[in-house]
A protein has these predicted regions:
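A short hydrophobic beta-strand segment most commonly corresponding to one strand
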Residues: 42, 94, 108-126
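Short hydrophobic/aromatic-rich beta-strand segments that constitute the beta-sheet cores
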Residues: 57, 76-78, 112
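A short beta-loop-beta micro-motif enriched in histidine and acidic residues
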Residues: 35-44, 51-68, 80-81
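A short, N-terminal "cap"/entry segment at the start of jelly-roll beta-barrel domains
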Residues: 1-42, 57, 123-133
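Asparagine-centered strand-capping/turn motif at beta-strand->loop junctions
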Residues: 104-105
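Short acidic-glycine-tyrosine-enriched beta hairpin
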Residues: 81-98
């Protein structure tokens, strides 16, 4: 964990100072709202908008990860074992350290909110080239 930090409360506008994350295959998008680039140390927060038929690239993190399905539906798929779990509006899911997964949108698309705890700095160094591999 990072060293000493001042205890402060900050309001973060999700439309300002975020980082586009090149993790979506399709017409949707993913943005980091709370990430190391704006001072996050203990957790990250991402908004992932997947349109119908979109999916994320295969993902894995050096930290635990939790997401909430704000709207829509889809599937979370384990890459290593091929397991799949349906996701509906209001669902939450946890990804363990090092587990590989992919999120796939259903026919209405889906919006997710979540991220890693603690922050996984390597995640923000992904390039479009690395994601396409």
């Amino acid at each position: 964990m990072p060293g000493k930090h001042h205890e402060t409360v900050r309001v973060i506008d999700s439309k300002v100072g975020g980082k586009l994350l090149p993790i979506v295959f399709g017409t949707g998008s993913a943005h980091a709202v709370l990430w190391p680039g704006n001072g996050a140390h203990y957790r990250s927060l991402h908004l992932i908008d997947l349109h119908p038929g979109d999916r994320t690239c295969d993902l894995s993190h050096a930290s635990e990860c939790i997401y909430y399905v704000e709207r829509g539906s889809g599937t979370i798929r384990g890459i290593d074992d091929g397991t799949a779990q349906d996701l509906v509006e209001g669902a939450m899911f946890h990804i363990g350290v090092g587990d590989a997964y992919r999120i796939e949108a259903g026919p209405q698309g889906m919006r997710l909110i979540g991220g890693t705890v603690p922050v996984d700095p390597a995640f923000y160094e992904l390039s479009q080239f690395e994601v396409a591999r």
